[in-house]
Amino acid sequence: TSCALDNCPAVANPGQANLDGDAEGDVCDASDATGLSITKISFRKSPKAASDVWGASGTLDAATSPTIAADVIAGGLTLAVKNQGAASVGSLTFAAASCKSVGKGGVKCTDAQKSTVKLSKRAAGDFRVTVSARKQSLASLPAVPADAPFTVTLTTPTSIDRNDAVGAVCSSTASAVKCKD
């Protein structure tokens, strides 16, 4: 592809895939697909090293991601959480080998620390998204309201990113933060 026509000149993408039809190719686009709706997120700091946890839940519109279960089984996925200042709060990466089909059209990925992400197909046609990150090392407990909202990005193979922010209402204690929309 000539440089003048390349939708992502900094990264090789011979197919020029552009799922959302904007000017950026999927491998350069920070938000390729819609449909992710995260409604809750929580963080808990443990006094023990490498024992912090965080979790998130919400839905994913199957109409915007009809092949997501097959894509995840074939290529894995990554989840990232950033605060409103775009600093990383936590992330999980699952290789294809750690993901399997569950239920009727769903998928579950589990890593060596027993962290999981589950996309459960529901009768309404959407997916219930459940994330449980275990044995993590959070640099510090996020401060609320200063760090809220939190952006959750679910990335599937070929760099398809789905983003949503959560944190309209947050509460905190000395060791935990909980936010919801």
What kind of feature is each model-predicted range?
Residues 1-34:
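Extracellular calcium-associated, cysteine-rich motifs in secreted modular proteins
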Residues 31-181:
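Extracellular glycoprotein-like low-complexity segments
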